[in-house]
């Protein structure tokens, strides 16, 4: 206590509502927040430095562990940066499957956000429902990659393997049902007086402040800024898809909640469009200097075996240069800045994680709010400490 009025407390790093090992030093006047100082680094693993001692292929699994709730979005951003340096084109089938999986990833990330955000405020039913739907997406991950979370599925030039025959039906059935599930969530929350009291007018940040800080993703669009990399700076074939970019009007927690629900509906539409575009074809580029040979060749010819061994043991050289690639991850703009010195390992990799930047808005959003409202504000930012600390 200072002057018997201002109290300084710690929230976290082990607190269920900080969504990871986030510590916040909070100054309070009674229950009113005066200042918040986020303290990060408890989950630092040195991903950027580790990449300098691994080949481009060996670096890919590290990206799974940034935002571990959206591994394929991480994979996509990294692979697009590598492919840009290599100058190779991805086959249409592989590109379409990438779109399907990154939009399913967006859905499952938003489902985890909704489940935890609702649970923080006391709506346990939505938590159970959202994790029920997420389980289907986790099963789809396992179906195509063998892993439920850290998928390591994308490759430079395409995918590690083609999807099985049952993939298309499973995804089509899920996205047909998903809008009805979203209706259920809205029926439980949107008109609920407790939910509205806890979210409307809470965590307000203006479009100007959000832009100045560098917020991206649903947190930015909730403040009324109409910006989405998929539409405005399209990549991976997104220019071929029709979808709406929702924005808020009141710049508060409730608007950010509504933006994410609409995004979930739009992701279902994108997946349906992608399924219609999904045609037979190769899932790896014709780039033998980068891509592994087919398994038949590896098992039945010495040339194929040597080819596989060379790429696995030495990696593939990437032309000298530097590139930045940003993608619209579920939480905002995820960027990879790669510098190549012509070898098979990155000279430097810099990750621009959306959660790290979005977290900088916490003081602006929470200043003057009640301590009890901080839980809702943290939830609406949808941060993951894996990508903040890296």
From Swiss-Prot:
Known EC number: 7.1.1.-
Official protein name in the record: NADH-quinone oxidoreductase subunit D
Keyword Magnesium recorded: no
Top-level EC class: translocase
Family in the record: Belongs to the complex I 49 kDa subunit family.
Function, in words: NDH-1 shuttles electrons from NADH, via FMN and iron-sulfur (Fe-S) centers, to quinones in the respiratory chain. The immediate electron acceptor for the enzyme in this species is believed to be ubiquinone. Couples the redox reaction to proton translocation (for every two electrons transferred, four hydrogen ions are translocated across the cytoplasmic membrane), and thus conserves the redox energy in a proton gradient.
Recorded topology in the membrane: Peripheral membrane protein
Species the sequence originates in: Trichlorobacter lovleyi (strain ATCC BAA-1151 / DSM 17278 / SZ) (Geobacter lovleyi)
Gene name in the database record: nuoD
Compartments where located: Cell inner membrane
GO CC annotations on file: plasma membrane
Quaternary organization: NDH-1 is composed of 14 different subunits. Subunits NuoB, C, D, E, F, and G constitute the peripheral sector of the complex.
């Amino acid at each position: 206590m200072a002057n018997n009025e201002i109290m300084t407390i710690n929230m976290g790093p082990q607190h269920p509502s900080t969504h990871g090992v986030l510590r916040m030093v909070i100054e309070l006047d009674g229950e009113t927040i005066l200042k918040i100082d986020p303290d990060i680094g408890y989950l630092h693993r040195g991903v950027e430095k580790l990449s300098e001692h691994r080949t481009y292929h060996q670096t890919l699994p590290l990206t799974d562990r940034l935002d571990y709730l959206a591994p394929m979005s991480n994979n996509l951003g990294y692979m697009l940066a590598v492919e840009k340096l290599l100058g190779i084109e991805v086959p249409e089938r592989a590109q379409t499957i990438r779109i399907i999986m990154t939009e399913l990833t967006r859905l499952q990330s938003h489902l985890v956000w909704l489940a935890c955000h609702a649970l923080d405020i006391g709506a346990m039913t939505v938590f159970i429902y959202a994790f029920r739907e997420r389980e289907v997406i986790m099963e789809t991950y396992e179906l195509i990659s063998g892993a439920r979370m850290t998928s390591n599925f994308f490759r430079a030039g395409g995918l590690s393997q083609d999807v099985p025959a049952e993939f298309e039906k499973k995804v089509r059935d899920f996205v047909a049902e998903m809008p009805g599930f979203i209706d259920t969530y809205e029926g439980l929350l949107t008109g609920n007086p407790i939910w509205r009291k806890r979210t409307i007018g809470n965590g307000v940040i203006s479009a100007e402040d959000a832009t100045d800080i560098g917020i991206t993703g649903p947190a930015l669009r909730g403040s009324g800024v109409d910006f989405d990399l998929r539409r405005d700076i399209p990549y991976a074939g997104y220019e071929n898809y029709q979808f709406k970019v929702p924005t808020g009007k009141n710049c508060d927690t409730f608007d950010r909640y509504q933006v994410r629900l609409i995004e979930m509906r739009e992701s279902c539409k994108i997946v349906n469009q992608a399924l219609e575009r999904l045609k037979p074809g190769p899932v790896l580029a014709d780039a033998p200097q980068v891509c592994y040979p087919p398994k038949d060749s590896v098992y039945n010819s010495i040339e194929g075996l040597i080819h596989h061994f060379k790429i696995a043991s030495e990696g593939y050289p990437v032309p000298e240069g530097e590139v930045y690639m940003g993608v619209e991850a579920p939480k905002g703009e995820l960027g990879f800045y790669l510098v190549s010195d012509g070898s098979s390992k990155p000279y430097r990799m810099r990750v621009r994680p959306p959660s790290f930047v979005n977290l900088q808005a916490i003081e602006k959003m929470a200043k003057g709010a009640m301590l009890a409202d901080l839980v809702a504000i943290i939830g609406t930012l949808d941060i993951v400490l894996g990508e903040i600390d890296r």
